[in-house]
Design a protein with these regions (language model features):
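Extreme N-terminal tail/first-helix region
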Residues: 1-19
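A short glycine-rich, His/Asp/Glu-containing loop-to-beta-strand
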Residues: 14-49, 102, 111-113
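Short, conserved beta-strand element in jelly-roll/cupin
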Residues: 42-45, 53-68
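Short hydrophobic/aromatic-rich beta-strand segments that constitute the beta-sheet cores
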Residues: 51, 68-70, 101-102
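Structural motif
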Residues: 58, 65-67, 74, 90, ...
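A cytosolic small-molecule/anion-sensing beta-strand core signal
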Residues: 62-63, 78-79, 95
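Short acidic-glycine-tyrosine-enriched beta hairpin
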Residues: 72-88
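Ligand-binding loop in jelly-roll beta-barrel domains
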Residues: 87-112
Length: 116
């Protein structure tokens, strides 16, 4: 059995936010934590259409309502909805949304290809 720490606790309010492709982001579990995935708390704001070559994303809508563009389709989203975005799918969230994104595998911040 490993002696490595088996857990990580991080409060979003203690993490310094910065502007990224989707809006204001706080990395709760990041690449340097060596977990299997990254977890980000994102305030959607002027998001840009983009895709990832190596990363799948799961969006959990914490608060708000809006829509998401997924390739050529637009879907409605609201608090409590989960959206799975496979790698290669062009996507963009629209509206006043607070989301939790789970990015698998880790390293998504080096795997963003903006289209606008």
């Amino acid at each position: 059995m490993s002696t490595q720490t088996a857990f990580l606790r991080r409060d979003p309010m203690t993490v310094e936010p910065w502007r990224e492709t989707c809006g204001q982001i706080r990395c709760l579990i990041e690449e340097r934590d060596q977990a299997a995935a990254e977890v980000h708390h994102v305030e959607i704001e002027n998001a840009k259409l983009h895709y990832h070559q190596r990363t799948d994303e799961i969006y959990y809508i914490i608060d708000g309502e809006g829509s998401m563009i997924l390739d050529d389709e637009t879907i409605e989203v609201h608090k409590g909805v989960v959206v799975y975005v496979p790698r290669g799918v062009k996507h963009k969230a629209i509206g006043r949304l607070t989301v939790l994104t789970v990015c698998i595998p880790r390293g998504v911040l080096n795997d963003v290809y903006e289209l606008e």
